[in-house]
Amino acid sequence: MRIGIYNHQHLRGGCPICTQTYVQGMIADGMKCMNRAKGIYGEDNELVNYTDLGDYPSENLERPGFRRLMKDIEEDNLDVIVVITLDKITTDIDLLMETYQTIRKHNIQLITANDGKKAMEILDKALVKWQENSN
């Protein structure tokens, strides 16, 4: 099984202490995602990291790590995606639903470190309502 772990941190300003804190937080988040993936899917999986650290606002889906993640989704190179929380993908609900729709189209599971597979149940319900409201 190939599991993608995506982490995004929008750096604001050039404060070295802030940057160090953000990086430490990203490392901790990445470890939590890896541990959650191993807890659900076992130890014998390939883990692939996708990271965006820099001046990349959440609404910008042209982040390098996110583009690489989406390319692997489109090419069916992943079985599971793990994020610490859904807002690491984007805070824009329409962009989140469009992204999730693509993930589901490729039969990829999306879990969060905090909610595990329950995140998909929530997103599946939200996707139905979002599609109804979009029509």
Q: What is each of the regions a protein language model found here?
A:
Residues 1-135:
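Short, structured surface patches at the beginning of a domain
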